[in-house]
Amino acid sequence: KNLILTIDNRIQRLAEKALGERIGAAVVLKPASGEVIAMVSYPYFDANVFSTDDSSVQYAMLASDKNKPMLNRVVNAEYPPASTFKTIMSTAILSEKLFPSDKKIECPGRITYGDRVFRCHVGVPGHGWLDLKNALAQSCDVYFWVLGTDYLGVDRISSYAQEFGFGQSLEIDLPAQTKGTVPTAQWKWRKYREKWLGGDTMNISIGQGYTLVTPLHVANMMAMVCNSGKIYRPHLLKEVRDPSKNNE
């Protein structure tokens, strides 16, 4: 059987060029169908080496490589979602209606919580007064810290993250995929025997801390936004053709 993939050769090459030789991953989805039209993980390897006489030696070399070329980072490497998570936070703020989206919060560039000082990425004097629209556009940390700790809380934040597919398999047609982590107070207690702290909520509000996702999770989240919440299962297989038949 011949397997026809959803990969678009032109976009695949563009993604490879954009990533270059930096260790990481790039993935492009077609929001209207879930088709994966580009998937890059670097470093990578030539699978043809396994058809040679010294395939066992080649495998051992790849397996021991500290840069892990056999790891498909698109679906099996975990990273903090960082500021992409503010998309989920914005959805939660609009849906829960606990804080008017046009009401402004001042960003002085930093905020004190307990005995810790959390600094916005722009530093002092900060972004000034921002509503939700501008806070998202400028990726203001202070705005989302305040909304996360004072209005949403860890349970709501985690629930919305799960609604966007975080913390679960996206069931792509590959042998395995890492689910990632969407932390809750219960999760932290089970894993570390530690209580959930306000600082933990600060961290997850901007996609940091214990939250971990794959690049595919983030691409899928943005596809859901494009589709107004509708989700399609990400997939690589377009069709299966029988080489003995005339497939046009």
Q: How should each PLM-predicted stretch be described?
A:
Residues 1-25, 32:
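Conserved, well-ordered alpha-helix/loop/beta-strand core segments that scaffold catalytic motifs
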Residues 7, 31-83, 88-248:
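Beta-lactam-recognizing serine transpeptidase/beta-lactamase-like catalytic domain environment
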